[in-house]
Amino acid sequence: MSPLPDLNKQTPIAVVAAGRLGSSMAIALTEAGYKVAAISSRQMSHREWLASRLKETLVVENAQTAANVASVVFITSPDAMIEDICSEIDWRSHQAVIHCAGVLPLSVLDRARVMGAETAGFHPLQTFPSSDSSTQLKNVSFATESLNPALFYWLWILATDLGGSAFKIESSQRAAYHASAVMACGLLAGLTGLAAEMWKPLGIDRDDALKKLIPLLRATIDALDEKGLPSAITGPYVRGDVETIEAHLEATSDNSEETFEAYRALAGASLHIAKE
C-alpha cells in the first residue's frame, strides 16, 4: 500500500472524461471549497462550457494531461469506458484513482494499482439530467469503497462536504446495489411510461398522460419519505379488492402484453411488503 499525501481540501483533484456526472461533480467540489486542478473532456463545445463555469480549473482534452497535475483523479466516464481510460494513463505512486460507477468492482482500476496508485469507488446514488446538476448531489448517498483507510476516510468526509453521506460497500455487493438503484430510477421511469400509454383509449397521448400522472408520483414519493413501507403502498392488492384486480388485469392485457406482464409481476412481487 503506497503512502498518500495528506488529503484535504487543498489536495489537487482532476476529473477525467467529464460528462453530466463529472461536470456536476467538478462544480460541486469547487463550490464545496475543494481544489479542482484539472478536468478533461473530448468535446470542444463542452470544454468551452466547462471553462466558463470553472475559471480556476485547467480544462483539457487529454486525460493524461489532467491526471498529471492531480493527486486525486476521478474517472467519471460511462462504465464501459472506465477500464480502458484507466489503462491508457501512466499513473504514479502517491496518486489516488477513483471510479464513480455503481456496478463495477475496484479491479477495473488494477492498471493504476499495479503502477503504485491507490484506488477507490465513489458512486453517487443519483441521476444527473444535465452537466449543470451540481445541486443534485445534496442529500445524496455515496457508495464508497477503498482498501486504503486514509483514502476511504477522505471520501467519507467529501460526501459530507458535498451535502450528502457515505456508506461502505464491497465490490461483491455492487451488482445488487446497482440493480436496486436502476429499479428505483430507470425502471420506475419505464413503468411510468407504460402507465401513461394506457391513457390512449381515453384520447390522451403519452406526454399528456405523463403530466397528469406526475402529481400522483410525487405524492407517492412523499408518502414513502414520510410514512415509509408498507404504509406508502396503496391500491386494490392492499384492500383485497378482487373485482378491481380482475378488471385491471383485463385492461392491461387489452393494452399490451408488456403492460399486463409488468402489472402482474410487480403486484405479485411486492405483495409480501404490502402484507407486512
What are these regions (language model features)?
Residues 1-65:
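NAD(P)+-binding Rossmann beta1-loop-alpha1 motif at the extreme N-terminus of oxidoreductases
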Residues 9-11, 95, 140:
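Nucleotide donor/acceptor-binding cores
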